[in-house]
Regions:
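Acetyl-CoA-dependent GNAT
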Residues: 5, 9, 13-87, 91-93, ...
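Conserved SAM-binding loop
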Residues: 11, 96, 120-123
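C-terminal "cap" of GNAT-fold acetyltransferases
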Residues: 47, 117-190
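Active-site acidic-Proline motif in GNAT/NAT acetyltransferases
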Residues: 91-97, 125-126
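Short coil/turn segments at alpha/beta junctions that flank glycine-rich nucleotide-binding fingerprints
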Residues: 97, 114-117
Length: 190
């Protein structure tokens, strides 16, 4: 009987056992962009996973395909009611399919449940698809910085947004138009 490959691709909380897979994913993305790869300097947070990404300090989520990590994102609590999004990576063949959005939404849910009101992130200027996603999800680009001494000559953009309540798609439950009237077909008897 032929084996059936499992292709769940759902967003799930990461375990410490996922760290090698996350590091492999980041190495694949670095290779795609022809970045210099040194895990000791590029992913120190992952090498101290529990300190950075265990509740209540933070959280980490992954997407797996056939047991292999193919997507990741982390969030770490900062000062006051602020958190920082880290490590949003997806294998190239999965980009543009909504999985990046699902990963960021998992971070936003964690922030809401943790009383976080503001989310920030830094992203390499070369990650255009990620920037488009962040902007579609309500993040604002606020500044740029160069990373001194970085072998990849990295310049990063800072993005931020208020966490706020969950945002529903137009026409979703409870959605209203500019007049304040509900969107969608009228309810019977209305």
């Amino acid at each position: 009987m032929p084996s059936v490959e499992r292709d769940d691709l759902g967003v799930v909380p990461a375990e410490a056992a996922d760290v090698p897979g996350v590091i492999d994913l980041i190495a694949r993305v670095f290779a795609e962009y022809r970045f210099v790869w040194d895990p000791l300097t590029e992913v120190p947070d992952l090498l101290a996973f529990d300190r950075h990404y265990r509740a209540p300090r933070g959280a980490f989520f992954v997407v797996r395909r056939n047991g292999r990590v193919v997507g990741s994102v982390g969030v770490e609590r900062g000062a006051e009611a602020t958190a920082e999004l880290h490590r949003l990576y997806l294998d190239a063949d999965l980009r543009g399919q909504g999985r990046g959005r699902a990963l960021v939404e998992a971070v936003l849910r964690w922030c809401r449940a943790s009383g976080i009101g503001h989310l920030v992130l830094w992203s390499d200027t070369r990650f255009d698809q990620a920037h488009a996603l962040y902007e579609r999800m309500g993040f604002r680009r606020t500044e740029a910085r160069d990373l001194a001494g970085d072998p990849n000559q990295t310049r990063e953009y800072r993005y931020e947004r208020a966490v706020g309540p969950a945002v529903e798609a137009p026409g979703g439950p409870g959605a209203t138009g500019p007049s304040g009237r509900p969107l969608g077909p009228p309810r019977p008897g209305a």
